[in-house]
Amino acid sequence: MSRRRLGSAVALAVLAAWSMPGLASADGRGPLQSLRMNEIQVIGTHNSYHRELSKPERAAHDAIYGGAPIYDNLLAYSHASLPNQLGRQGVRGLELDLYPDPAGGRYANPLLRRRLAAGPLTAPEWYSPGIKIIHTADLDYHSTCVRLASCLRLVRRWSRANRGHVPLLILLELKETDPVAGALGGVSVPPWDGAALDRLDAEIRSVFRRSELITPDDVRRPGLTLQRSVVRRGWPTLRRARGRVMFLMDNGPGAISAAYTAGRPSLHGRVLFTNSRPGRPDAAFVKRNEPRGANLNQIRRLVRAGYLVRTRSDEPLATVLSGDTTQRRAALSSGAQLVSTDFPEVGMSARYDRDYVVALPGGGSVRCNPVIRPRPCRSRHP
């Protein structure tokens, strides 16, 4: 075998081992540790906690919107538990929707259940103080885990059992009062003001040790804003980042992110990375959900500039029902480091007589980034 062919074979073997879910979890000191954490691509799930309403609840849900089968067309999907997504499905990104509940019990008697005379929800965690995980309060509320702290403990337990994993990216959407439910007597969601945001940071820190997190303070360089740090100096290497968890704010620029960055324009002392506008002091993470059309090149430019980007490969359930995979192809080729889907496993779309699934080319839980892949990192399936 020639030296060139031998070198290529070794590079492919290294990448294959690195990409396999089991080996990715075990490999903490492999030859690719000098890669930076933005030089890879992983699959994440959208609404990672979501479980579907019962048939009576769906009927009550759709009656609110005039009787059209809205739920079955948009929300009829369920995810495995968070540990199963991370383990069996090889997911490395999660999304959780958050509702503040400092006293406990605020969301325990949803509007739909009141209309059905079904009684309040019975799980004790609904009545405990602490942030809750809900898609839409009153209207779509079943979850694999109810309290944020409980969900995060599941993630931490998996992480500690698989210490060599690439960084887990956890997207948090901070929810507010739903206008439809609110108009019908639904719950009033407390504001995400400075105090609530401080409680969010504290709740995350109550589960994860400082050494288990990647925060803006870990990325920002002395004398530079967070944005200039990632653009000029780059992200941490995988050697530093493996086995750790990173939290990203889903909400775009607005009142909530303004409250989170108040007095901390580069997120000093904060846990979350905000979804910001490129060029702003806090801009390290950017969300671009639609990867098709002109957005494809925009995402590639952002990735090349040094930003961490999240995009989506599908919209439930239109993508599955249509059979159109252009969004999936665009998302995977965009270079966005986090590609989110509702169908990360073979068989999840079979109920719709489809075989739609989103996976990295060649399989595995992680691959070299297709847009900013460094020379030593060669994928068999670019």
Indicate where each model-derived feature is located.
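Catalytic cores of phosphodiester-bond hydrolases, prominently lipid phosphodiesterases
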Residues: 27-382
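Secretory targeting and sorting signals
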Residues: 2-26, 97
